[in-house]
Amino acid sequence: MRHYYSVDTIRAAEAPLLASLPDGALMRRAAFGLATEIGRELTARTGGVVGRRVCAVVGSGDNGGDALWAATFLRRRGAAADAVLLNPDRTHRKALAAFTKSGGRLVESVSAATDLVIDGVVGISGSGPLRPAAAQVFAAVQAAAIPVVAVDIPSGIDVATGAITGPAVHAALTVTFGGLKPVHALADCGRVVLVDIGLDLAHTDVLGFEATDVAARWPVPGPRDDKYTQGVTGVLAGSSTYPGAAVLCTGAAVAATSGMVRYAGTAHAEVLAHWPEVIASPTPAAAGRVQAWVVGPGLGTDEAGAAALWFALDTDLPVLVDADGLTMLADHPDLVAGRNAPTVLTPHAGEFARLAGAPPGDDRVGACRQLADALGATVLLKGNVTVIADPGGPVYLNPAGQSWAATAGSGDVLSGMIGALLASGLPSGEAAAAAAFVHARASAAAAADPGPGDAPTSASRISGHIRAALAAL
């Protein structure tokens, strides 16, 4: 499990170490880890460290000190080291002295011969975009295609929200210390490496699943299981206008677990043509017993669609609401707020704005939490980084790592997957987070098939790669 910590939590954990260690020892410990990772990056890119050139772009304060100490350690390993001081009067004095003593050079700009740039401009206590001088330096670095290693966070990106409101550093690698911060999931930080500096960190409720976490939770049939005990998923989706939504949603539910899927709606003929294992009926009342309902994809907002939504929410079963269901729900939020059974809402940004009365804005975690608490429902906010908030509970962050899932019908596939996990008995937040993780893996696999490179994919192909993504966990 990945844990993401606030700046205040990190600072509180650093305090006892700073009080007990000799002055500067914690900075040098962090910088040594940073230099080690930079050395690995240099070796991977250029074949070694000796004779290579690094340049630290140094701001005021400890972040710049980390960068200077790392450059000093690399200098001792045989690299040439330069430093651009953005604020010479406020540069970390001890780190600067060590850097110059090691033979490091102070320069006005980054040389075109530089193999790697160290971003030591702004640390986790900073905020806002790059100031003009730093922005100019990194614009030149980007134009020259020199890779950047960021110290703790890429400068110019908000540490708590991942928001970028102006010029910011584009990092190939970010090396962070002690614990991950939300920005490492919410923004593009390149590859992220965590260096252990000995912090004793308190509890965090901002989490991220890893493959082992998903594998441990995904239902696997046991020797006493049958199609009913594994969970029966009910799907209320599709219409004469959008029958494909029903096909995609039910197909994903079929692929996600080994139980049973029941479908009710006007697209039952199309569903059976694609998935003969589905039990299909024309109305929800005729569907039979299920353990969870998925309602909304392609459903329409007419009287029949409203009746299906009301039917599902009136049960004491877990319910996932998506797409047209969310559009109708925006006018009747009390239908969810009054439920005792688990409810999962899966809006994109536009649907979120209708539900919450305002778009999520830069603070997607805070906005998702607020809506989940207000409605008493698990909220999954779609995006390249999926944010899942449990009411009064944890938030799960799932960075997809690519954008191949941004295709029509992809959300219908995700809804079917989550519904199947709800039917299996998984708690709503974990079901949403696990499904989002596998959905992202399936999207990447679909884009990579048949290879050798990635290519545009579709929701049907994403659904077709769910099983492969599960098998690879």
From Swiss-Prot:
Span list, region NADPHX 1: 62-66, 123-129
Domain YjeF C-terminal intervals: 210-473
EC identifiers of the protein: 4.2.1.136, 5.1.99.6
Signal peptide residue numbers: none
Location of the region described as NADPHX 2 in the Swiss-Prot/TrEMBL record: 348-354
Details of cofactor binding: Binds 1 potassium ion per subunit.
Keyword Transmembrane helix: no
InterPro entries (alphabetical): Carbohydrate_kinase_pred_CS, CARKD, Nnr, Ribokinase-like, YjeF_N_dom, YjeF_N_dom_sf
Residues noted as binding K(+) in the record, renumbered to the chain: N63, D119, S155
Binding, ADP: 382-386, 402-411
Residue span, YjeF N-terminal domain: 10-205
Function: Bifunctional enzyme that catalyzes the epimerization of the S- and R-forms of NAD(P)HX and the dehydration of the S-form of NAD(P)HX at the expense of ADP, which is converted to AMP. This allows the repair of both epimers of NAD(P)HX, a damaged form of NAD(P)H that is a result of enzymatic or heat-dependent hydration.
The protein, known as: Bifunctional NAD(P)H-hydrate repair enzyme Nnr
